[in-house]
Amino acid sequence: MRTRNKIIKEVIQCAEENGWHVDAERHQDKNIVIFEFSQFTPAGQDFFFSATMQGRSLESLVSDMEEYYEGFDADSEAYLWLDGNGHGKNGAPYRMKDVLADMEAAEGMVCKLLEAVRGLAD
């Protein structure tokens, strides 16, 4: 059986091999590890999300990542980056379709990472 530290190292290595930066914050009192995954989207947005691992259960991390991925709505995320006229704001691409394409790319990035981390459980 793998130790929690070994699992953490494997997750970090897997994510980094897939182009992600990872911070892992251990909460000993709650017996959890919170992973924060970040990567730039094709349009340059610093995209990130967090997922939690319970104890040394890689399956709990995969489950939390699946929940995030399944709940990710590229349209809603794109809307957050649009101004009142439907143009990108805060460094987002100017055209609405480009903002949406960037959020769809982010969704694909999460999917690819999820598949890679899921592969660690095999």
Language-model segment annotations:
Residues 1-43, 119-122:
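Negatively charged, low-complexity tracts enriched in Asp/Glu with abundant Ser/Thr
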